[in-house]
A protein has these predicted regions:
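N-terminal signal peptide c-region/cleavage motif recognized by signal peptidases
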Residues: 16-18
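Interaction/scaffold regions that mediate signaling and macromolecular assembly across diverse proteins
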Residues: 22-87, 91-265
């Protein structure tokens, strides 16, 4: 009996960091599964902000739980747990930011001031500091060099139609690789944001703004063109088109970004 109690305690000690990291996101998982809907044959999603607003206390409790994670605890996690945590934090606080003015808002950009954007607003209590959304994305995720994964651009969501879809579930450590791959393909499949016409490849402006992130050797890709070819199937590229892109023989143009709110009508 005593041995069993000790064994259970030891198992709990070994499992607690993982179980805490995963159970932490359960409220966010429930909110997303209820209030985010696929559109455009699944290539995008829209968000029922009115329903989110009705459950804002649940969202706030989740954000408070994220805020209790210390830098020491975070640093002890493997990087896939860290990255899932940071993506969820970014997306959840973005929804909270929208709810501060919804329904009297048509775009997240309306929440900025004349000399500052909504992404520079410091309202996020995370890892012992008050941060902005920019800080989460560009410092904690992109700036450390720890993750070096350009697919995060298809996971963090800026509450706009032009953004990659807000995933209908929380990011988790054990599913992160699968989720990032699926989100990348999902975005590239959306012909309203990425397509070929008249021997020109038209891409979302995301690829222009963060071009350098796609040149850092992810899966052997040292250029945007090489990254695109990795996901040739999602773009429905034939062999000739793939070769033209590899050889820089195809023009690439970047589409205007749609900043309208990704709200469910």
């Amino acid at each position: 009996m005593k041995f069993s109690a000790i064994f259970i305690t030891l198992v709990g000690l070994f499992l607690s960091p993982t179980s805490h990291a995963e159970s932490l996101h359960s409220p966010w998982q429930q909110l997303l599964s209820k209030h985010v809907y696929p559109i455009n044959q699944g290539s995008g999603t829209e968000v029922d902000y009115q329903a989110f607003k009705a459950q804002r206390n649940t969202l706030k409790n989740y954000l408070e739980a994220l805020s209790t994670v210390s830098q020491t605890e975070f640093d002890a996690w493997p990087k896939h747990k860290q990255l899932a945590f940071l993506i969820n934090a970014y997306n959840a606080w973005t929804v909270e930011l929208i709810l501060t003015e919804y329904p009297n808002i048509d775009s997240i950009k309306e929440l900025g001031r004349f000399f500052s954007s909504p992404w520079s607003k410091k309202f996020v209590s995370l890892l012992g500091e008050t941060r902005s959304l920019d800080n989460i994305e560009h410092t904690l995720i992109r700036g450390t060099g720890r993750y070096n994964d350009p697919r995060i651009h298809f996971a963090v969501n800026c509450a706009s139609i032009g953004c990659p879809a807000l995933l209908e579930e929380a990011y988790t450590a054990d599913k992160l690789e699968q989720q990032l791959t699926a989100q990348t393909k999902r975005f590239l499949t959306d012909t309203s944001r990425n397509y070929i016409a008249d021997d020109t490849l038209y891409l979302s402006s995301i690829f222009k703004w963060y071009k350098s992130d796609f040149e850092q050797g992810f899966k052997g890709a040292n250029s945007l063109n090489e990254f695109i070819v990795i996901y040739a199937d999602a773009l429905n590229l034939n062999q000739n088109q793939q070769q033209a892109i590899k050889n820089n023989d195809m023009d690439i143009e970047f589409l205007d970004y749609n900043w309208a709110l990704n709200a469910k009508n």
